[in-house]
Every structure is written in C-alpha cells, then in structure tokens.
Amino acid sequence: MPQALSTDILIVGGGIAGLWLNARLRRAGYATVLVESASLGGGQSVKSQGIIHGGAKYALHGALTGASEAIADMPRRWRACLGSDGELDLRGVRLLSEAHYLWSPGGLAGSLTSFFASKAVRSRVEQAKGEDLPPALRDKGFKGKAYRLTEIVFDVPDLIRRLAELAGDSLLAGERIEPLREGRELAGLCVDGREIRAQRVVLSAGAGNEALLRELGLEQPAMQRRPLHMVMVKAATLKPLYAHCLGAGPKPRITVTTHPTRDGQSVWYLGGDIAETDGVARDEAAQIAEARRELAKLLPWIDLGQAQWATLRVDRAEPAQSNLLRPDNAFLAEQGRLLVGWPTKLALAPDFADRVCARLEEDGIRPSEHAALPQLPRPPLAEPAWEVAFA
C-alpha cells in the first residue's frame, strides 16, 4: 500500500490555475500536494492562446463592463512576475509577444477610432502605424487601423513548464480519487489507494471538477461548458500576428495568435467569433473552409497555398451562469474543508489564487509542520495541441 501523506493544502487539477495556486501557497510557507490525473496543463490550459487580457475586447461596443474592470489589472500582475517583484518568479518564461493588438478592416476603422477616443480606454491602447504594425499587417494591401493593447502573450507550454518547476516535489500523478473521511468530515483524499490528509482540499480541475464533486457526493457548485471550435493553420509563409480583428458584433471577428513549432515553422491559432456558436455547429471541413474564407478576406496578401489545417474543440468549464453567459471573475465556493473553483479565464489565475488565500486567512488555516514528501510519481507536461495535430 502506498505511503500515507499529510499536507496543509491538497490541490486537485494541474492546469495553470492549480499550478499557480500551488506556487503561491508554497511561497507563503504552506505544505502542498497537487494531484493531476493526466498531463500538466492538458485540459484547457495548453489549448489557450496565451493572451493575458486586460479587458479591452470586452469593452468593444460601449462602456467598460464588469468583465473588463475585473480583469484590468491582470497584465500588470503577470508582467511583474517576469521581473523580480512579482508574486511568482516567472523570469525566463518565453513571451510570444510584448503586446496584443486590435485591428479593423477598412470599413470599420471609424467606429474603432471613436471607441479608442473614449477616456476609459485611452490609457490602455495606442495606435500602431508603419514599422510598429504587427509583421502580418505590414503590407500595402492593409487599409484598416491597428491599435496596440497593454496585453502580453505567453508561450503557454513554457509557462506550464516553469510553474511545474516551482512545484518542486509536490506533484503527484493520480487517476483514482476518492474522499477520505473521518466521521462525516472530509479529512483529505484517497489517491490510487494512497491516503492524503490535508487541512483543506481545493478542486481546480476545470471540467474535471464536475466528476470530482459527484465522487464526493456533491451537486453544487454546478458547472457549465461553453464550447469552442478553434482552427490551426501551419505554413512557412506565416508572419507573426497577435491580434483581435474587429467585427460588427460584440466579440472579435477572429483572434489570431502565432506559435512556433518544433520544426521551425509557425502555427496561427484562430479563435474569436469564428470559434463560437456557429463554429461549434460546423464539422471540421466546414470550419476550415470558413477560416480559409475569412483569412482570404482579411489578409489576402498572406500566401496560404501550402498551408496545413486542423481544428480543435475545447470546452471552457465555468461555474454555471444564467443563460450560459461568461462569468466576470474567478469563482470559489467553500463547503467545510473543501474549496471548489474555476478561474474562468487564463488571465484570472492570480485572482483565483487570491480568493483561495483570502479564504484560508479567514478560516485561520496556517502553515504547519509535515514530514518531507517521498519521491512521488510525477505527471508529464502536456504536448502543445499543434504538435499533436500536425505530427
């Protein structure tokens, strides 16, 4: 029988939210164990575009919303971690771009200008022209306008690698997770037959929270899934582009990020409105055809004749909302010794950790003495989606 363990905080779910929380708690002196059933970052995290949103895209058609205000400070907090004064040490993690951009095709430039003239938005953006344009927009055929946002874009696989480093010896690969009770109280979890006692158990497993709650005999908090149908384009002719393209609706028409591949080429990863409801309803062939049409209209000077195409379906797991709306903040619920949450967005991982740390403080949960952990089976790092799709 595997050796029983004792720790302060037991975390289930090794995506960026769980790994970030784990690193924050360890830095604060807590003993932790983080359990992952598959690969680190392999759920939603590694399928993220890596944009640390500051909320500009949520304010595209009117006043700043709750969503844009809640998320406004996130780029500053993440950027601080790349230096010496952040809440975590992410020095050396690869940034794909120092800025994300917003561009409008010719016909919509006027509405974009008036939007960015508003006082609420002015401090977050600046117009880009000439050599300051993203390389993919530096063409005489580009007739629109582009604005540089104060949002950074991380290489997500490299971010996951660094957060796994910060976890030290606290990571545990474990598939079968059952409640460990003392009387009626949750005392910890039994992971593949190994008892792990903890002062608090945190579920941060994204879509996996639903099954974990069921295993613990709980129906609340309820979860919703908002699906996406993303598109990947691989070609030697691609130029770097990290940008939202403005459409007529409240969501970006298309959101493009550029990712290096192991064979020295690049992949454009396409989200935004194309990946939402209509895109979800399309099969792979129809979704690729739609992406081809959109890129031919928006960026006709980019040669995609030899490009490879693939799609990827992703479920965004979140606390249930009325009308399947997008939650504005990270979410955390408490039931006795159990904390359950979703960051709801990559950029809000620090907000999720804030909420857990605040709850521990309120409940008087302090770091305590525990025996050193033995060598534990360690979960692997997730493979980037494009390396799998274009293998």
UniProtKB/Swiss-Prot annotation:
<feature type="binding site">
    <location>
        <position position="36"/>
    </location>
    <ligand>
        <name>FAD</name>
    </ligand>
</feature>
<dbReference type="GO" id="GO:0071949">
    <property type="term" value="F:FAD binding"/>
</dbReference>
<feature type="binding site">
    <location>
        <begin position="44"/>
        <end position="45"/>
    </location>
    <ligand>
        <name>FAD</name>
    </ligand>
</feature>
<dbReference type="Pfam" id="PF01266">
    <property type="entry name" value="DAO"/>
</dbReference>
<keyword id="KW-0285">Flavoprotein</keyword>
<dbReference type="GO" id="GO:0016491">
    <property type="term" value="F:oxidoreductase activity"/>
</dbReference>
<keyword id="KW-0560">Oxidoreductase</keyword>
<keyword id="KW-0274">FAD</keyword>
<dbReference type="GO" id="GO:0005737">
    <property type="term" value="C:cytoplasm"/>
</dbReference>
<feature type="binding site">
    <location>
        <begin position="346"/>
        <end position="347"/>
    </location>
    <ligand>
        <name>FAD</name>
    </ligand>
</feature>
<feature type="binding site">
    <location>
        <begin position="49"/>
        <end position="51"/>
    </location>
    <ligand>
        <name>FAD</name>
    </ligand>
</feature>
<feature type="binding site">
    <location>
        <position position="17"/>
    </location>
    <ligand>
        <name>FAD</name>
    </ligand>
</feature>
<comment type="similarity">
    <text>Belongs to the DAO family.</text>
</comment>
<protein>
    <recommendedName>
        <fullName>Probable FAD-dependent oxidoreductase PA4991</fullName>
        <ecNumber>1.-.-.-</ecNumber>
    </recommendedName>
</protein>
<dbReference type="InterPro" id="IPR036188">
    <property type="entry name" value="FAD/NAD-bd_sf"/>
</dbReference>
<comment type="subunit">
    <text>Monomer.</text>
</comment>
<dbReference type="InterPro" id="IPR006076">
    <property type="entry name" value="FAD-dep_OxRdtase"/>
</dbReference>
<comment type="function">
    <text>Probably functions as a FAD-dependent oxidoreductase, whose physiological substrate is unknown. Does not display amino-acid oxidase or glycerol-3-phosphate dehydrogenase activities. Is essential for growth of P.aeruginosa in the sputum of cystic fibrosis patients.</text>
</comment>
